[in-house]
């Protein structure tokens, strides 16, 4: 298959393919074909234009990143954008959706956004929970889920030594949360 509409194969004679590329679908470039200085398109990349990114190894060299998709093309190719992460197999790290703190979703994993618990570590606490809550490697949507937070925050009326163990149920109002049960919790 020719590269981006260039005749004569995919060697040095191919030249620039720029606007001739026309897209990154399977009809554009095969994975092993690349026209300098244009970034090769692999079928998994859904960008409308490859643009110039200096790669010369079919989307898997300095151009394509470890996954051979859009990689280090710069964050504007492949439908993810520099922030949105709608196709996060391509970009890492991703940006958090509104309502999630900047410390969320800064790991090597990149799923659509903070609303997915498997994306973020650590996560931000929801309103009403202290900053010491949800600072572990586990991240469920937020403090309202007891399996997220360790240690958890005590509700008003419970002493500070209550609920400071690895167990965390929603709060001190549940006596099964506190080890030891240091106060008279209303249940």
UniProtKB/Swiss-Prot annotation:
Sequence repeats: 28-31, 34-37, 40-43, 109-112, 119-122, 138-141, 148-151, 167-170, 177-180
Gene Ontology CC terms, in alphabetical order: cytosol; intermediate filament
Tissue: Restricted to hair root, not detected in any other tissues. Expressed in cuticle layers of differentiating hair follicles.
Chain positions covered by the region annotation 9 X 4 AA repeats of C-C-X-P: 28-180
Keyword set includes rRNA-binding: no
One of the record's GO molecular function terms: structural constituent of skin epidermis
Keyword list, A-Z: Keratin, Repeat
Functional summary from the UniProt entry: In the hair cortex, hair keratin intermediate filaments are embedded in an interfilamentous matrix, consisting of hair keratin-associated protein (KRTAP), which are essential for the formation of a rigid and resistant hair shaft through their extensive disulfide bond cross-linking with abundant cysteine residues of hair keratins. The matrix proteins include the high-sulfur and high-glycine-tyrosine keratins.
Family, per entry: Belongs to the KRTAP type 5 family.
Stated name of the protein: Keratin-associated protein 5-8
Species of provenance: Homo sapiens
Gene name of the record: KRTAP5-8
